[in-house]
Amino acid sequence: MRASKIIQEAALLSGRGDIADYIEATDRTNFSKETSKACNQMVTLLNMMISELCTSFIPMIATEKIYATDKIEYDKLSKNAVEILKIYDAFGKEVDFKVDYEHVKISSPCAKVVYKFHPKTYALTDNIDYEEKDISGSVLAYGLAAEFALTEGDFDRACSFHDRYVEGVHAISKPKNSTVK
């Protein structure tokens, strides 16, 4: 899922077709500084929103092949790990581990690590680490439109978008076996 597509959708929801056009344009010299600034603000808001979302509601999870015999250094992982969930050996059997400050101690050689991570700061053209199966781009666009409306001082619109965003996040993050009473 590309950051630019989420921002475009949020811009259109917010009545800011100029930002959507700015993102699509190959030559941006004809756009105002205000449009460029608003687009950059949306990129910043998207990063803040994703950071909150991955730490509070829908974690980003990576599965990575890595070979280690006694410990895994955090800097050897491709993403910024915040919690190690599982470690497997070459045969798919879970490996016992202990988390330390600088590394993870493992009880036997491992081949795969599953962990929660905090994403990098995304640029407009980056793909974000969420996939549509994790959360839809439309839900993210509603959240971004809500945040942007707050910065514009449009509290009624912000509440409307926020309600849609929260409804989408709760529908996704609700346990699969939960029942409604």
What are these regions (language model features)?
Residues 1-181:
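Glycine-enriched, solvent-exposed interface loops adjoining structured elements
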